[in-house]
Regions:
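Divalent-cation
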Residues: 1-86
Length: 86
């Protein structure tokens, strides 16, 4: 049986939050909708199957655990590089 598509959305406001939060997550149709909303809003999308498995275990609107900081920092670095191309 093929695995279902999974997706998560992160938010980080360094002035208000200590760490990034998982603000949306899901699989199947929910994942497709998360990706569609990101695309419609011109938000960068990074595929990382290992990280999505870990993020899918984080409760909604909760900060990512410290053990995931490095992996999540790499995602935000990717976003920064993608959105700040000149």
């Amino acid at each position: 049986m093929p695995s279902r598509k999974k997706a998560a959305a992160l938010r980080y406001n360094e002035e208000k939050e200590n760490a990034p939060k998982v603000v949306a997550k899901g699989e199947g149709e929910v994942a497709k909708n998360i990706i569609k909303i990101a695309e419609l809003n011109n938000l960068p999308i990074k595929k990382d199957e290992d990280l999505i498995e870990l993020l899918s275990k984080v409760e909604l609107d909760k900060e990512v655990p410290e053990a995931l900081y490095k992996a999540v920092a790499e995602v935000f670095s990717f976003i920064y590089r993608t959105t700040n191309k000149s």
